Swiss-Prot record:
Regions of compositional bias (Polar residues) in chain numbering: 1-20
Native species: Vaccinia virus (strain Copenhagen)
The organism's taxonomic lineage, starting at the top: Viruses, Varidnaviria, Bamfordvirae, Nucleocytoviricota, Pokkesviricetes
Annotated spans, Disordered: 1-31
Protein name listed in UniProt: 7 kDa A-type inclusion protein
Length: 65
């Protein structure tokens, strides 16, 4: 049995180091316009109507008779 077909340790080290040095792909950076700023929330408030209010049990308990 001859040892000519068995790769040497140095060959393994070279191939492993080449793989390890490859940097992973960078994730896409989200663009700034994808985020909602606090200014846009304040400047565009959702319209609120009194009809949106509903009585809860605790409200009935706290309201004077």
């Amino acid at each position: 049995m001859s040892n000519q077909n068995i790769p040497q340790l140095s060959e393994y080290q070279t191939s492993v180091s080449q793989v390890a040095v490859t940097p992973p792909p960078k994730p896409e950076t989200p663009q700034i316009f994808e985020y909602q700023t606090s200014d846009s929330i304040v400047n565009n408030p959702r319209p609120f109507y009194n009809s949106d209010l509903e009585f809860d049990d605790i409200d009935m308990y706290l309201l004077p008779n």
